[in-house]
A protein has these predicted regions:
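Active-site rim helix/loop that mediates acceptor-substrate recognition in acyltransferases
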Residues: 28-49
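Short amphipathic alpha-helix that is part of the acyltransferase structural core
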Residues: 1-33
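Conserved acetyl-CoA binding element of GNAT-fold acetyltransferases
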Residues: 70-82
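Conserved acetyl-CoA-binding loop-helix of GNAT-fold acetyltransferases
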Residues: 84-99
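Conserved GNAT acetyl-CoA-binding A-motif
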Residues: 100-112
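Conserved beta-strand in the GNAT
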Residues: 51, 57-66, 73
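Alpha-helical elements of Rossmann-like donor-binding domains used by nucleotide-donor carbohydrate transfer enzymes
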Residues: 14-18, 37, 91, 95
Length: 119
């Protein structure tokens, strides 16, 4: 059973490990950058940062949104071992769709995230 919830500061390490290679090809450098980037998200849009946990309380997915007045940005969308965690993908999609129901602005999404959303 998976559960979606708002990200907390104590989740930053796990999320940074998951997204490190998005920040740099060197894993250690990427981790440091991802950690700072994730902390920044929690400061800027704390109510729009989500994680999905498995039954062992391990984070298997993360999504960060920037719902702005003129541009709605899907900043990060990551699912670990997506073939085994399709339910996590479904939970994130459902959360995202709730946001998009009333959005009448441009939606920005990186191609990598978009590919995951439609798969």
């Amino acid at each position: 059973m998976l559960e979606i919830r708002n990200m907390r500061v104590e989740d930053v390490e796990a999320v940074a490990e998951m997204v490190a290679l998005d920040h740099d090809s060197d894993l250690e450098k990427g981790y440091k950058e991802a950690r700072e980037h994730t902390l920044d998200h929690l400061k800027i849009v704390p109510d729009h940062c989500y994680v999905v946990e498995d039954r062992d309380k391990q984070i298997v997915a993360a999504m960060i949104l920037h719902p702005q007045e003129k541009v709605f940005e899907i900043e990060d969308f990551h699912v670990r071992d997506i073939q085994q965690n399709k339910e996590a993908l479904t939970l994130l999609k459902e959360k995202l769709l709730k946001y998009l129901e009333g959005v009448e602005t441009e939606v920005l999404c990186c191609p990598y995230a978009l590919r995951r959303l439609i798969t």
